């Protein structure tokens, strides 16, 4: 069981039960969220309760840590790279698991003028949006920047596998700049290989996408203010993606 969970525990005394539940819940819902496993020995369950003042958690306690923000300096660099690009693409995977991320990604993509490829492990972007390029491998052939947000398997959408020969070829140009926002190696397990081939990135920001996306949007909006050249380039990029939709 330990190989499949973030944390497992078996209390050996009734006094440890409330604390184990507090730790289990906090561990489970802290991003990257994952399952926990708790079990109780039959002896402990059947033993007569003799403790008269079992300490329970206070009502005003914070049940889990606040989400982790991404480094603003790295986000600023990412904004510069994307705004200077000709054909930037945002690759998204699991961000749809948090309420509100759907709308945050739409705002981010429209602000930056990026095409968006939703890997569809969790619905993250509307497929009727003009910037949606999911399953359009031709759009990746011109990508000069790819920003992955909460992506686990980079190779699946960006490469082609010939099943008969096991040959793998990339849809993306060799000089493409790769960047990442998400939990990266925090999601890794020493046992489970539920991740794809490692993709080297030029810029990586460790942080929760629910905070990083609006922050990156805000940074980009500041850079776009009173800069007609950047705005014109952004709008031109968006038209290229929308014309393919």
Task: Describe each model-derived feature in a short phrase.
Residues 1-31, 142-143, 148-149, 196-204, ...:
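Conserved thiamine diphosphate
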Residues 7, 83-89:
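Short, surface-exposed connector motifs at secondary-structure boundaries
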Residues 14-15, 64-70, 123-127:
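Short, flexible loop segments at the rims of nucleotide/cofactor-binding pockets, characterized by
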Residues 15, 39-40, 174-245:
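Phosphate/pyrophosphate-binding active-site segments
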Residues 19, 69-70, 98:
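Structural/interface elements that position substrates and couple domains in central-metabolism enzymes
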Residues 22-27, 53-55, 102-113, 162-170, ...:
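Short, solvent-exposed amphipathic alpha-helical segments in soluble enzyme
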Residues 23, 27-84, 203-207, 239-244:
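Conformationally flexible catalytic loops at phosphate/diphosphate-handling active centers
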Residues 92-183, 187:
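Glycine-rich, anion-gripping cofactor-binding loops and their flanking helix/strand elements
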């Amino acid at each position: 069981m330990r190989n499949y969970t973030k944390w497992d525990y078996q209390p050996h005394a009734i006094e440890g039960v409330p604390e184990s539940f507090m730790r289990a819940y906090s561990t489970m819902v802290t991003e990257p969220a994952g399952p926990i496993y708790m079990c109780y020995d039959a002896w402990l369950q059947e033993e007569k309760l003799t403790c008269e003042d079992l300490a329970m958690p206070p009502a005003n306690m914070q049940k889990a840590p606040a989400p982790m923000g991404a480094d603003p300096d790295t986000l600023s660099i990412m904004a510069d790279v994307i705004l200077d690009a000709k054909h930037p693409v945002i690759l998204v995977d699991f961000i749809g698991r948090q309420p509100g991320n759907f709308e945050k990604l739409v705002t981010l993509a429209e602000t930056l003028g990026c095409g968006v490829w939703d890997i569809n492990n969790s619905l993250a972007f509307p497929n009727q949006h003009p910037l949606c390029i999911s399953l359009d491998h031709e759009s990746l052939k011109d990508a000069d920047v790819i920003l992955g947000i909460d992506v686990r398997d980079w190779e699946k959408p960006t490469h082609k596998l010939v099943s008969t020969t096991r040959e793998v070829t990339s849809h993306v140009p060799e000089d493409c700049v790769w960047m990442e926002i998400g939990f990266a190696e925090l999601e890794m397990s020493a046992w489970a290989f539920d991740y794809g081939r490692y993709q080297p990135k030029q810029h990586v920001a460790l942080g929760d996408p629910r905070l990083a996306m609006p922050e990156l949007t805000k940074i980009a909006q500041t850079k776009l203010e009173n800069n007609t050249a950047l705005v014109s380039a952004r709008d031109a990029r968006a038209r290229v993606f929308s014309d393919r939709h």
